[in-house]
Amino acid sequence: MTEKRNIFLIGPMGAGKSTIGRHLAQQLSMEFYDSDQEIEKRTGVDVSWIFDIEGELGFRKREQKIISEIIDKRGIVLSTGGGSILSREIRNKLSSRGVVIYLETSVEKQLVRTKKNKQRPLLQVDNTSIQTVLEELAFHRNPLYQSIADITIRMNDRSIKAIVFYIIRLLNNF
């Protein structure tokens, strides 16, 4: 990969986008951005607080604005929020401005990775099981992830290092 193209990681919460993104950026000597962290940095509050005060719609507006700004940069790795692909505008921009990598994971893996995390607003449910919420999100979002993915990586039990090097190999042939 001689020219440093933007790399955009998409997928559901708990897929490993932030972790893989940081390691991938480090290996490729690229700048790393996490859209949720950028929102928190710019607002001074965490994502859960924004959801509580502004609702999901308010959060999505902020997310769309920040992602639109970040993807104008060159030679970056961006880990997007799981719901960012709900915006047609964001899907179009991601597709046209870099390589989109979908980190596909099962609901079972998501449950393991998210069960102790109280910072995920969509999982703060009263009368619904977290598994049901994740299954519903997957039903609606997985087709959107698939529709814009240039590369799909099935997240399994491989190490972070193995996944990162696999992605780099795929990018070199892309």
Curated annotation (Swiss-Prot):
Pathway: Metabolic intermediate biosynthesis; chorismate biosynthesis; chorismate from D-erythrose 4-phosphate and phosphoenolpyruvate: step 5/7
Binding locations of Mg(2+): 18
Entry keyword annotation includes Amino-acid biosynthesis: yes
Record: residues binding ATP: 14-19, 120, 158
GO biological process: amino acid biosynthetic process; aromatic amino acid family biosynthetic process; chorismate biosynthetic process
Cofactor note: Binds 1 Mg(2+) ion per subunit.
InterPro entries to which the protein is assigned, alphabetical: P-loop_NTPase, Shikimate/glucono_kinase, Shikimate_kinase/TSH1, Shikimate_kinase_CS
EC number(s) given by UniProt: 2.7.1.71
Location of the protein in the cell: Cytoplasm
Residues annotated for substrate binding in this entry: 36, 60, 82, 141
Keywords, comma-separated and alphabetical: Amino-acid biosynthesis, Aromatic amino acid biosynthesis, ATP-binding, Cytoplasm, Kinase, Magnesium, Metal-binding, Nucleotide-binding, Transferase
Enzyme class: transferase
GO CC, any one term: cytosol
Cofactor requirements of the protein: Mg(2+)
SUPFAM superfamilies registered for this protein in UniProt: P-loop containing nucleoside triphosphate hydrolases
GO molecular function: ATP binding; magnesium ion binding; shikimate kinase activity
Catalytic reactions on record: shikimate + ATP = 3-phosphoshikimate + ADP + H(+)
Subunit structure: Monomer.
Function per UniProt: Catalyzes the specific phosphorylation of the 3-hydroxyl group of shikimic acid using ATP as a cosubstrate.
Recorded family membership: Belongs to the shikimate kinase family.
Family matches, as NCBIfam families: PRK05057.1 (NF003456)
UniProt protein name: Shikimate kinase
